């Protein structure tokens, strides 16, 4: 098994921040080098082991979607080769897993679009028959396809905390009504276009999370990762009907296998408390998870 890149170490650029997956470096005052590591987090805890090749796979998926959806909204890509801004001895850490992007002013909200009822949306629906203030028909079950995609924003949490679902009205208070309307309309258009493309490749995109920023001219710009298995719920179409009939989610092209293993593992006879440090991931879990991410990319680009 090839080694995972848990952390990039670039000496030629100043480090801005390390997130759950990405290491961001300043390139002058107007650009950022985003390096996607092989780190993996579950339950908001970063695992001690990485998934070899995950960062490159995520980057390739994001670039695929930026290309397919570029007609809808501008994105943060500069078009420049990330390798061009690092020292020769750093190229191997950067090639294939990085994006050189514009430095933007991020909007302080996550733009979540749901086409199916799952996860926190399903939980909220059971209690209120709505999700983030969006009323839904009675009688829906887990993994049900919604009559139309819905926009359910969330506030961005600090690393280690959960994002908090908010109403559209609250989002309008945070960023302004006009900008909120634009973000909602563009997010639904992005999701709808991507969902149609993915369906033709045998993938259901149940839900996804977009991030936007403003450039120096105030132009709304799509940023960060887009429609990757880390920011979206990807379901294989061939397993959907049987899972839906049983009221459960289909297996997904992401880290769900890791989450399931963590839920089942016992430490001194007790379940893991979902606090750092996480239990060490066995090799078979790592290999299976890497293959799952790879299959998502291969289906999309076939």
UniProtKB/Swiss-Prot annotation:
GO terms for biological process: 'de novo' IMP biosynthetic process. Its EC number is 6.3.2.6. Keywords: ATP-binding, Ligase, Nucleotide-binding, Purine biosynthesis. It catalyses: 5-amino-1-(5-phospho-D-ribosyl)imidazole-4-carboxylate + L-aspartate + ATP = (2S)-2-[5-amino-1-(5-phospho-beta-D-ribosyl)imidazole-4-carboxamido]succinate + ADP + phosphate + 2 H(+). The keyword Nucleotide-binding applies. It holds the Pfam family SAICAR_synt. This is Phosphoribosylaminoimidazole-succinocarboxamide synthase. Belongs to the SAICAR synthetase family.
């Amino acid at each position: 098994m090839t080694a995972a890149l848990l952390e990039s170490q670039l000496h030629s650029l100043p480090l801005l921040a390390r997130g759950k997956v990405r290491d961001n470096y300043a390139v002058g005052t107007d650009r950022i080098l985003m390096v996607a590591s092989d780190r993996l987090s579950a339950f908001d805890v970063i695992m001690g082991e990485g998934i070899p090749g995950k960062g490159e796979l995520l980057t390739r998926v994001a670039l695929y979607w930026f290309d397919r959806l570029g007609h809808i909204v501008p994105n943060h890509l500069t078009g420049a080769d990330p390798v061009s801004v690092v020292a020769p001895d750093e190229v191997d850490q950067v090639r294939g897993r990085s994006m050189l992007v514009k430095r933007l002013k991020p909007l302080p909200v996550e733009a979540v679009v749901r086409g199916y009822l799952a996860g926190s949306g399903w939980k909220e629906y059971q209690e209120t028959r709505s999700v983030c203030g969006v009323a839904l028909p009675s009688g829906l079950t887990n993994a049900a396809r919604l009559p139309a995609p819905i926009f359910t924003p969330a506030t961005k949490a600090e690393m280690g905390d959960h994002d908090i679902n908010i109403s559209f009205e609250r989002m309008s208070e945070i960023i302004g009504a006009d900008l909120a309307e634009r973000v909602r309309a563009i997010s639904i258009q992005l999701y709808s276009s991507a969902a149609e493309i993915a369906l033709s490749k045998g993938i259901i995109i149940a839900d996804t999370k977009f991030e936007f920023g403003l450039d120096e001219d105030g132009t709304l710009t799509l940023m960060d990762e887009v429609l990757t298995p880390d920011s979206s719920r990807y379901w294989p179409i061939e397993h959907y009907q049987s899972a839906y009939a049983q009221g459960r989610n289909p297996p997904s092209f992401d880290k769900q296998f890791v989450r399931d293993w963590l839920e089942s593992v016992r430490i001194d006879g007790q379940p893991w408390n979902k606090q750092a440090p996480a239990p060490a991931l066995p090799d078979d879990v790592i290999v299976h998870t890497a293959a799952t991410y790879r299959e998502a990319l291969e289906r999309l680009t076939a």
